[in-house]
Amino acid sequence: ISQSQGSMTSGVDGKSLDGMSEKRISALIESIRSFSYQPNPARRVYIEKKNSTKKRPLGIPSTEDKLVQEVVKMILESIYEPNFSDCSHGFRPKRSCHSALQQIQNQFTGITWFVEGDIHACFDSFGHHVLVNILRERIEDENFLALIWKMLKAGYMEQWAYNCTFSGTPQGSGVSPILANIYLSKLDDFAENLKKSFNKGKSKENLEYQRAASKLYYIRRKNRANWENWNEQQRKEALRLQKDAINYMHSLPSKRANNKEYKSLVYCRYADDFLIGVIGSFEDASEI
């Protein structure tokens, strides 16, 4: 926790992590054991959004709440992380927007239509009852679920006024990202089932793409064989030709687009943004 950005920022109680002691931790553990633990409301602040004049609300938890949230996150990750979809890239260990782009580069080939989705106010709109029922499918410990329920209902303070939270998981909470992924895993499951029912037939290679790939292969082989013997100008010209060949190959679909016997769907999600690639008709994409 101490290594994360904003870890030393205090919540509504004015306490920060640098004042943490063994006595405070022991008292926190005892309050959880006795079921008397009650999270403080988060201190709401607003931060700038990139490429926008709007500001994003951010909840800053109290120090004790940060510790509890981190432990809850670790438990949830141990339960859910092994079963999350490979198409999910947001807020996950060893995954990022870079892994999402890598999946798109590798799997979204020959796509004829794209369906793009952005879930508006995602973190603020999760149904609490729906989320807990999803958790209950895998977790039998009602005391643990009750602890998460308290976190969801803790509310927030803004301009010294208390506000209830009726839905969503507050941005800034350490447990919000994993809860969001658990909630949205239902979308991932839906996309996977849709893919199984939609996909049919076998793809046919695009001959023009194959010719471009072969040309690129020979250019690269020629460059490697002659590189040491070329002068600077020859090397620049060789790299230019190789780059042109790469760009041309990437501009072509690897599969034939007019194969009506073949349909395919691919899906990728990063947090609340998702992308569906469709090889099929416009009607297929519209229905999806």
Q: Which stretches of residues belong to each language-model region?
A:
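Non-catalytic terminal/accessory segments
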Residues: 1-288
